[in-house]
A protein has these predicted regions:
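Acetyl-CoA-dependent GNAT
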Residues: 4-72, 95, 99, 127-128, ...
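Residue-level recognition of the GNAT/N-acetyltransferase active site
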Residues: 6, 76, 80, 109
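Charged catalytic carboxylate motif
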Residues: 9-12, 87-88, 114
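Conserved acetyl-CoA-binding loop-helix of GNAT-fold acetyltransferases
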Residues: 75, 81-94, 121
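Conserved GNAT acetyl-CoA-binding A-motif
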Residues: 96-108
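Conserved beta-strand-loop-alpha-helix junction that forms the acyl-donor binding cleft
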Residues: 106-115, 134
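Conserved acetyl-CoA-binding loop of GNAT-fold acetyltransferases
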Residues: 120-129
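Short, charged, solvent-exposed linker or helix-capping segments at domain edges/interfaces
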Residues: 142-147
Length: 147
């Protein structure tokens, strides 16, 4: 079952993130407070996948009024290759469409072979015509990668 994510899901979603090799978790943005702030700003667009009462997948999804963005798209390794990821993406995009968002993007690490193959398989286009820039406003927001 795919449903909207709520802050009550945080502990289970965070535990899922911690299980995934190579997953980058930010100390502030991905804290309970950070995710709660994100969900308050985007109350309808983030989703979880639930199997037998257990959260096995999640997407943080939001928008700025113009473009949507997917973050932390993941499915527990034991549940992959069953359409869960695709179904979560479809649900998140339906919610974006309902809010009149016409385009959605995401960032995937270049070394994330599984993720990059997934996005190609479900019809997403890899952009080759732009550069991605960022500027850190809070140095305390450290990213740690799971091993």
């Amino acid at each position: 079952m795919i449903r909207r994510m709520t802050i009550e899901d945080y502990d289970d979603v965070h535990a899922l993130w911690m299980k995934i090799k190579g997953f980058g978790i930010r100390s502030i943005d991905d804290s309970r407070e950070g995710v709660e702030r994100f969900l308050k700003r985007n109350p309808t667009t983030s989703v979880v996948a639930v199997e037998d009462g257990t959260i096995v997948g999640s997407i943080l999804c939001g928008h700025d009024g113009r473009r949507g963005c997917l973050y932390h798209v993941c499915v527990d390794e034991a549940y992959r290759m069953h359409g869960i990821g695709r179904n979560m993406v479809v649900k998140a995009m339906e919610e974006l469409k309902a809010e009149h968002i016409n385009k959605v993007s995401l960032i995937a690490f270049t070394k994330n072979d599984i993720g990059n193959a997934f996005w190609k398989e479900i019809g997403w286009t890899k952009r080759e015509d732009l550069n991605y820039y960022e500027f850190t406003l809070n140095e305390a927001n450290i990213t740690a990668f799971n091993r």
